[in-house]
């Protein structure tokens, strides 16, 4: 699920089993394609959340720049049982107030973020394999 307000984009995921500790490797990655262009970013994703997780309430947000993931800021998150919420600053990832459209994907325990085959081979993804969720708000 995704939602937004003036300041943040919010993401929620619910898993079948309790979510593992944030200290696990390759834990609960949130991949965001802000420009909805598969030809930009890493495998089309412009931002990744949770590539490095310093605490049980704060995580990192990284952007794909010069063929590498670069830290650009932090995001708040909470885990309770099998649910996880993340709040990402719109300003941090370039989500303008006038337009709210992006693609996103969750990936847990994939081994190589640069290999698209990982989405079908290792770990779990939502949605499956190379599919993305699309979030779009119609402006009135």
What is the meaning of each model-derived region?
Residues 46-47, 82, 131-134:
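A structural detector for short beta-strand units
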Residues 116-140:
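Short beta-strand elements
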Residues 97-99, 128:
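Solvent-exposed, conformationally flexible loop/turn segments
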Residues 1-58, 100-103, 107-122:
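Surface-exposed, glycine/proline- and aromatic-rich loop segments on solvent-exposed faces
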Residues 24, 80, 129-131:
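A short, structural micro-pattern
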Residues 52-81:
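Glycine-aromatic-enriched beta-strand/loop faces of beta-sandwich-type recognition domains
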Residues 11-13, 59-63, 82-88:
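Generic recognition of long tandem-repeat/solenoid scaffolds
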Residues 78-97:
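Localized edge beta-strand/strand-to-loop motifs within extracellular or lumenal beta-rich domains
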């Amino acid at each position: 699920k995704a939602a937004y307000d003036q300041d943040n984009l919010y993401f929620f995921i619910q898993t079948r089993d309790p979510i593992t500790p944030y200290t696990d490797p390759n834990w609960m990655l949130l991949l965001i394609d802000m420009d909805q262009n598969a030809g930009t970013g890493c495998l089309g994703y412009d931002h990744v959340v949770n590539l490095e997780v310093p605490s049980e309430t704060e995580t990192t947000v990284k952007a794909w720049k010069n063929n590498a993931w670069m830290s650009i800021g932090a995001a708040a998150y909470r885990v309770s049982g099998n649910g996880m919420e993340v709040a990402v600053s719109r300003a941090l990832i370039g989500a303008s107030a006038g337009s709210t459209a992006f693609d996103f994907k969750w990936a847990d325990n994939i081994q190589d973020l640069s290999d698209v085959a990982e989405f079908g081979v290792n770990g779990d993804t939502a949605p499956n394999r190379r599919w993305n969720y699309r979030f779009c708000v119609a402006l009135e």
